[in-house]
Amino acid sequence: MRIVYFTHSLRSCWNHGNAHFLRGVLSELVERGHDVRVFEPEGSWSLENLLKDHGESGLQSFSANYPELSSRTYSRAEEGAAQAWGADLVIVHEWNEPELVAAVGRLRARGGRFTLLFHDTHHRAVSAPSEMRSYELDSYDGVLAFGATLARVYERWGWGERVFVWHEAADMRRFRPPEEEARREGLVWIGNWGDGERSAEIVEFLLRPGRDAGLPVDIYGVRYPDDAKRRLNQFGARYHGWLANAAAPAVFADHLATVHVPRRFYTQALPGIPTIRVFEALACGIPLVSAPWDDCEHLFRVGEDFLMVADGEAMTNALRDLANDPQLREKLVRSGLETIRKRHTCGHRADELMTIVERLRAPVLESAA
């Protein structure tokens, strides 16, 4: 099958979490023999920021770890949309300009014989609904939503049975436990400051508990304003800046535990969506403690795959327990890995995507018969 995917950027993961899952699932599809072609706009915001901060060397991790993947750029929406001709499946991610989304839809309406899907992995459907409603999706066959609560938003917008839950997942080809265990020390958090969506929570569930539990804290991520960096210094946390996503497994392997601090939209308006770092951390075999969120889809076995706490004091206690109890750490790692391998790999998501495409095509095939 020829698969065309339109993304904000395949090459850059600078403040671009969707690149993590996209690389993993497209790599899986390539491995299965599909002809995968990726297109991104010239001068994408994420790529420009990566190059500004790190130059061409910032791209080396992607090219070294994903030699089977590449992307081509386009300068105008119509030029980009034209690349969909001849495809069997076209997926357009929500972090594309509305002009590109509309142009691909027009191509489909003019006789494009491909299945056309819109892929939403963000909270804008609830945080900025007017923006999302402005996308022209009339000619799209379906929507891929990265959680059931987001899917229900699209159902209310009239998509009915044409919206499908397609969670993110771990790329087990690259995100896996170290082959040999070495000394682990301290707490690590890989994540961006959060645009004001979790600033207080980072202090309550990461910085203060890490300090109070007596654990050194290492932080990786971007978009930390000066006042955020001062806050890190106040609690003795070490800030390292951007980390290429493919380097995350090695960083996890050096640390005793990690923490998940969800953005407020994923604890209030869109519960049940863990975002990709939970999948990746568990796949790497690092014990994880999470700030509260509602796993309403039962993606994990909370309390077995990872610990979840209600407040900062409970987080401090959980981190102390992990630091002092190697059996607890081993139990969490074993359980978390089991759940990822059984349900949440990019291989599972590739299977789900093929099932979705078959389901969307089935009525056409039946009527043609």
Q: Each predicted region: which residue ranges?
A:
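Extended catalytic core of nucleotide-activated donor transferases of GT-like folds
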Residues: 9, 23-27, 37-154, 269
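A short, glycine/small-residue-rich beta-strand->loop->alpha-helix junction that serves as a flexible
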Residues: 9-21, 196-200
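Short amphipathic alpha-helix
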Residues: 18-29, 204-206, 353
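Catalytic binding pocket for nucleotide-activated donors in carbohydrate/polymer assembly enzymes
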Residues: 21-24, 40-41, 229-361, 365
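Short, polar loop motifs at secondary-structure junctions
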Residues: 43, 147-152, 221-227, 292-295
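Well-ordered beta-strand positions
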Residues: 89, 141-142, 162, 257, ...
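Carbohydrate-associated surface elements
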Residues: 149, 166-169
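Conserved catalytic-core segment of nucleotide-activated headgroup transferases in glycan assembly
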Residues: 171-257, 265
